[in-house]
Structure formats: C-alpha cells, structure tokens
Design a protein with these regions (language model features):
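Basic, low-complexity terminal or inter-domain segments flanking catalytic cores
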Residues: 2-3, 15, 74, 132-133, ...
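Conserved nucleotide-binding/hydrolysis micro-motifs of P-loop NTPases
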Residues: 10-13, 30-36, 88-92, 116-121, ...
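A conserved hydrophobic secondary-structure block that centers on an alpha-helix together
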Residues: 261, 265-269
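Metal- or metallocofactor-binding catalytic centers and their adjacent structured scaffolds
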Residues: 218-253, 259, 424-430, 437, ...
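Short acidic, hydrophobic short linear motifs in intrinsically disordered regions
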Residues: 237-240, 248-262, 287-291, 443-455, ...
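Intrinsically disordered, low-complexity regulatory segments
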Residues: 1-146, 154-155, 214, 313, ...
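C-terminal or mid-to-C-terminal helical accessory/interaction module adjacent to the motor/catalytic core
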Residues: 118-202, 242-246
C-alpha cells in the first residue's frame, strides 16, 4: 500500500479502490468527524463572537474508532501520500478540512480530489488532477454552520420560554413554516364563487365528440334560459382551424427538480428521494445528486446521442445544451444523470430502480427531438331565434390534438390522441346531450413536498443540499404534518337538455380531498406568528435569500466570513436581548368557546404546553379546571361549543375486560387510546367516542400479547430481562445493559443479571428533561 484515499461513505470505498488498483487503499470518514461543541469544559462560549466568531470543535464520540484507524493508516503511508476524496460540495470540502486538522495533515499541500461520478475514467482523471482544500468553500460552510448554531442557541430558549408548546426555531426552517401557514390561511379565507359550465356531446357520422360553450353563466336561471333556447336550434360548423405545434423536453434533473418530479410521479418524499439517489451515486450508477446545474458534459451528450440514434433512429436525436438559470450554480458541475446511459437496471431495490429509471429517461429525453403536434379547433355556431342576448355570439368549441411525431415523448411523458371526426365548414351536427353543470372556484392548493421545494428554490431559500433536511425538520419538530384530507360533500346543480326538454337534478360532489399534502399544525401557526411579530428577519423571505447569496459570495472569495456573520448577528442579538419584555400571556390568545350547561363554567380554547387544548373552568377558581384536546381538524379560532362539550364526555367507560376491569377510552397527547389499569393502548384510527367493546377488547388482548413477548423475565427487586428495539437487554430502571450476543436471554438468572448490571458500563435509561429558561438564558454570556 503506497497511497491512502479518504472518502465520506464506506459504501463507495470498495468501488473506488477497485478502480484505483493495488497501490491505493480507500477508507471512509463515515461522514462528518467533528462538530461545534455543545458545551465547553470551562464554560466559555462554543462560538467566540468577539474573536471573529471563532468556533471550538470536538471529535464526535462515535467517530473515535474511525479516527484511530485513519491515523494508523496515515502513519503507514506518510502524509504526502494521503488523498482527500470527500464529496464535491461545501460540506465535503469542510470534512476534508476537518480531516486535515484531526489527522495533522498540511492544508496547503495535502492532495484533494473531487469527482461527480464514480467511474474508472473519472476517478483516474481526478487522481491526475489533484488540488488542495478550497478554504473559500470551507469558510462558506462554516459561516452557515455557525450562523445556524447561533440562531438555534439563542432563539430556541426564547421560544421555550415565551411560546406555549414551543420547541425550537431554525434560520431556514422557520420561513418554510411561514410559507405553509400563509397558504393555509389563504385557503381558510377563500370564498368560492359558482358558475354554470355548458358542455355538449355532438354526433357526426356516428362518432361522438365533446365541445364546450365559449361562455359561462353566473346563475341557474341564466343557464336554464340558455338550455331552453336550444329546443329549436341547429348546430352548424362555422370554422375549422388546424395549427402545428411542438413540445420540447425538460432539462436534465437538478436536486430540486428531481425531488419535485419524484414526489409528483413516484410519490417519494424529499428525504426518500435523496436516500435513493445517495445509494445510486455510491454504487456508481448516477452522478453526484446535490447540484443546481442542468449542464451535461460533452462526453455524456455524445453517449446519449449515440444511444438514441442506435435505438430510435437519427430523427429522434437533437443535441441540446441547457443553460442553468441559478446564479449560484457552478457550470463545471453536471446535472444528475446516469453514468452509463445504456444501463437499464441499476438496482434490485424497487425504490432505487424507480428513481434511476426516472433519471435515465429524463436524461435521454433532454437529448431527443421535440414532439410534433397538430392541434384542431372546430367552432360550432348555434342557429336559433330564441337565444338570449349576449355580448358575444354563443358558440361551441371542440378541441383535438394529434401527435404526428412523438420525439422525446417516446421515452418521457406521452399523450393519448384526442381525435375529432372529419368535418367541413357548413356541416350540420346533431346534439346528443347538452349539460350545464354548476362549478366552483377552487382555493389555492396546499403544498406537497415537491411544490414546497419548488417554492423555496424560487425564493432563493436553501440550497440543493438542504431542501430535504428543511422539510424533514419542520415535520420532526411537529410544526408541520403530512396528511390526507377526506374533503367534504356538497350539492351540485346539474341542468340537462336531451333534445326535447330541460331537466334539473342535484348530485353529490366531493371537494377538498387531498393526499400527502403539508399542513401546518397549531404549534406551527403559533411559532410562525411569534417569529413574524418579534423576529421578523428570521422569517423574512428576502432576508433569508440574501443570507444564502452571501454564503455564495464567501464561497466565491467575494465576502469575508466575519463581515457576513457580524452583519447578521448584531441586529439579531439585539432582538434577543429585547425579548425579555415579551408577554407570554399574549402569545397565542385564549378564546372563550361558551358555557358548560352542567357546571355553568366557561370552556376556553387555548394553547398549553403540548399545543392547543380545551379548558373547563378557570385556573384561579376553587376547583381545578379539567382539560381536553381539541377535536380532530378543529382550531382555537373555529372549535364550537358542541364540539367542546363532546370532548369533555371523555374519558368514556367502554365496558369491562373479561376479568372485570374497566376499559376507559380517551384522547391524549399522542392520540386516541384505551386504558385498563396502568396499561395504555393506542386505538388509532378508532374514535374514543364510538369504539365498540368488542374492538377495545381485541386491541387490549393484542397489547397484552405484545407485552408478554417483550418481557422475557422479571425478578422481585424490579430487575427485568426485556426484548428491545435493538435486541434483548437487562434493566433495573436506571441502567440498561445489552445482553452479549452469545448468551440466550431466556437462560439469564437473577444472579447473572445483577452481575452484568454491576460489571458492564451502560447508558442510563432516558428520562425526558424539560428545561425552564431563565430571564437571562437567551442572552449571550
């Protein structure tokens, strides 16, 4: 072994070592190896603001073995033979810098190589063209990391102290939550209007075709008058227009467009998309998956062109070079594409293969000819003397589209032809059925993960490496939920003319039904309002985008890191210092819903420690108030007295178990449940108001069975042998010890359990600690 190459991921280490041969040994750092300390031993701040934001780093405890192995190998080959091959983005550059620091490698001379795909030619070429660590990229990554840590470190305690149920606040996540909250309020305020849309089914030469009237009616009366006027009317073709058209393929994928398309076409979340893309990249099947470039290399274009010509013929090939619109994009980088365009199957994993197929087809389509179309519009005049007067003549229009050459649609997209009968101007057509149906304007659509990524990109918030993390974080914190909405049924008026008479009917239509949309929780709305009122810059879209631009300037050596950080931190910290004057009682207003007729006490909807809730009675009254959660789908502003009274009927005695214990149904912090003695059983998606005794007993029995499987043994002093998420273990309530792999947990005696507890170093059992922020906790010490 003469050379050591250090990569980020162990998954790609073997592949790269195979390409480089016996003179190279490839090891992995397994991602980041150091992070900013959470707390220093001497109490000094982890980030010294006064000293140009100097940050103190520490090796992550779980990476100590990795570092030991790397140091041993560095010593074996010599520092001059170490190659840093971490990823080609800013995070990768920062990891390379940290490796230099921890492994005592000279930053000025240590060889740094980058590649956007894991192929033999690319790896070999990278070895021939090494550079050194780019400190501008490192500084940009550090600026982001320091800024995000400062915001979290100083703003989160304010949120804990001032916002009921507040968890934390992030610099980039908070504007994303605000976007979702604003969209939700647009939907809530939306007042729809209805109109009547008229469609007709005509017949010519035994072929039916559909046409739409060129005007809509605001009232049922107007629509009815129009349909009745058709009783003596004739329908004559007055014009036939045919226009050629083309449809061009989209550019190859960037990180953003891949997440959008995978969400739309495959139903993948942003996190799942990036996980599959990471695996495909590590396996050498696609190029680097974090990019905002739509550029393809000349070699990639040539390979795609050759493949298209051989498979489909020269008419299907059109060479294209797409121009990246993003100002921050680096054209030296490439779009996401297959490393071998001829490879159809890249993975045995169905999710990875679906994503690969999407990437491959999009890449091929980008180098294929436009689709050619012929669009036909047939205009049909209404000849009759009873037509109501209107500003423009009432006409029906039938539209058809025929693909005359499929081009790129051969591999990506594809439309069905919309055929029309062969007609000539002056031909008379017969109406088979004419309908005026009530339609309603629609409110703005809730964001999907894909459409939110698109909006963030449009606003300049975040970068390719951060979109998936942003969306995952706001859901993890409980500010946003991905949910389905069943929608509501509504009555729709339908007027129908069958050639003889006009009939009226009412049909049921479901509206507002959605799947997989992002919905802000009440806590999300509260945190967005709080930050908008008191920390405007944190949720301001333009400000957040400008910060991203400044990171780009640091990366391009056009701005000093300390200058940028001071520009953000100084006004931000001033707001933190002023936050002590914020009145917590005015954050998240209370609302009296009504009076409970049984107790004559007020029912109040308000925010509590875990989010919105209902309170029966005053906190300063003689009796302690009762509490209940809000009904599903209700908000503090909208919950009714009837809904609230229903919630206070809980807990409800459903019945008894077979051995005579009461079964109580209720709703708690984590949803609906039943309780038998000290045992709690989730009953999602059952309703505690209506769950039957039979169903409750069934769920209770299943829980008992699961608990029995979990408890392997229990001794009189409280020591237990349990089956856990990560395998069998022993616990005494304060200490957990993993059972050795060669030991059967069922054979462990009390003495053996005590021996393992006393001789094994173990982590204490986790207990939730709620920190209470002091008045000065938000201030920089």
């Amino acid at each position: 072994m003469k050379n050591l190459v250090i990569v980020e991921s162990p998954a790609k280490a073997k592949t790269i070592e195979k390409y480089l041969g016996k003179d190279f040994h490839v090891l992995s750092s397994v991602g980041h190896i150091r992070s900013i300390v959470k707390k220093t031993k001497d109490g000094t701040p982890p980030i010294d603001v006064a000293n140009d934001f100097f940050a103190i780093y520490e090796v992550d405890p779980e990476k100590k073995k990795v570092i030991t192995e790397l140091k041993k190998n560095v010593k074996a080959v010599g520092k001059e033979n170490v190659w840093l091959a971490t990823d080609e983005d800013r995070e990768g550059e920062a990891i390379a810098w940290h490796l230099c620091k921890v492994l005592d490698l000279p930053i000025e001379t240590t060889k740094r190589i980058v590649f956007h795909e894991i192929t033999k030619d690319t790896i070999t070429n990278a070895i021939k063209n090494p550079r050194t660590v780019d400190m501008n990229l490192v500084q940009a990554q550090q600026a982001r990391q320091i800024l995000d840590r400062l915001v979290g470190f100083e703003l989160s305690p304010v949120v804990w102290q001032k916002v009921p149920g507040g968890k934390s606040a992030g610099r980039v996540q908070s504007p994303a939550v605000r976007l979702l909250v604003e969209r939700e309020r647009e939907i809530m305020k939306f007042e729809g209007n209805s109109q009547f849309k008229v469609t007709a089914i005509f017949i010519h030469d035994n072929q039916e075709f559909k046409a739409e009237l060129n005007q809509k009616f605001d009232t049922e009366e107007a629509a009815s008058e129009f349909l009745n006027s058709l009783k003596s009317a004739e329908f004559v073709v007055s014009d036939i227009s045919k226009t050629p058209g083309t449809r061009n393929p989209a550019a190859p994928f960037t990180t953003s467009t891949l997440q959008q398309e995978a969400n739309s076409k495959l139903g993948f979340s942003s996190k799942a998309t990036m996980a599959s893309a990471q695996k495909l990249y590590q396996d050498g099947k696609i190029t680097y998956m974090r990019t905002d470039s739509v550029n393809l290399s000349g070699q990639a274009i040539a390979a795609a062109t050759d493949f298209i010509k051989r498979l489909y013929g020269p008419d299907y090939s059109t060479v294209r070079k797409f121009k990246t619109k993003s100002a921050s994009a680096q054209e030296a980088h490439e779009a996401i594409r297959p490393t071998d365009i001829t490879l159809e199957t890249a993975s045995n994993n169905s999710y990875d293969q679906k994503l690969y197929d999407l990437i491959r087809r999009r890449t091929l389509a980008s180098q294929m000819s436009p689709a050619k179309l012929e669009k036909t519009t047939i205009t049909i005049d209404i000849k009759g003397d009873k037509l109501p007067k209107s500003k423009k003549p009432a006409q029906f229009e039938a539209k058809g589209e025929v693909i005359t050459f499929d081009g790129f649609l051969r591999v990506y997209g594809g439309n069905k032809d919309e055929l029309l009968p062969k007609l000539q101007s002056g031909d008379e057509v017969n109406s088979h059925d004419i309908t005026a149906r009530q339609t309603f304007t629609r409110p703005p659509a809730r964001y999907t993960e894909g459409s939110l990524v698109k909006k963030l990109e449009e606003l300049g918030i975040g970068r390719p490496s951060t979109y998936a993390t942003i969306i995952d974080t706001i859901q993890t914190r409980g500010y946003v939920e991905k949910g389905d909405s069943e929608g509501q049924s509504r009555d729709v008026i339908v007027l129908n003319y069958n050639g003889e008479e006009v009939s009226r009917s009412i049909v049921q239509e479901k509206t507002g039904s959605t799947r997989g949309k992002l919905i802000p929780t009440p806590s999300g709305e509260l945190i967005a309002d709080f930050l908008t009122d008191h920390f405007t810059q944190i949720v301001d879209y333009d400000f957040t985008a400008n910060v991203e631009t400044e990171f780009d300037k640091i990366a391009g050596a056009n701005l000093e890191k300390s200058t940028m950080l001071h520009g953000f931190y100084t006004p931000f910290h001033k707001l933190i210092e002023q936050s002590g004057g914020i009145d917590r009682s005015k954050v998240g207003a209370n609302r009296e819903v009504g009076i409970d007729p049984k107790t004559n006490k007020p029912i109040i909807a308000r925010f509590g420690r875990f989010g919105p809730m209902l309170q029966l009675g005053e906190t300063d009254g003689d009796e302690k108030p009762r509490f209940a959660p809000l009904p599903k789908g209700a908000k503090i502003e909208t919950v009714t007295l009837e809904q609230a009274l229903e919630m206070f009927k809980l807990p409800r005695i459903v019945g008894q178990t077979e051995d005579g214990q009461d079964i109580k149904a209720n709703i708690g912090r984590f949803g609906p449940y039943i309780q038998v003695g000290k045992l709690f059983v989730s009953i999602k998606p059952e309703d505690p108001h209506s769950i039957t005794l039979e169903k409750a007993r069934e769920l209770y029995a299943a829980k008992l069975e699961a608990e029995a499987a979990k408890n392997i043994a229990e001794f009189p002093d409280g020591v237990k042998v349990l089956n856990g998420r990560f395998g069998p273990y022993i616990t005494n309530g304060t200490k957990n010890v993993k059972i050795p792999k060669d030991t059967d947990p069922k054979t462990i005696t009390h003495e053996k359990a005590l021996e393992l507890l006393s001789t094994t170093t173990a982590k204490p059992t986790r207990k939730r600690v709620v920190k209470k922020a002091s008045k000065t906790s938000a201030k920089k010490k």
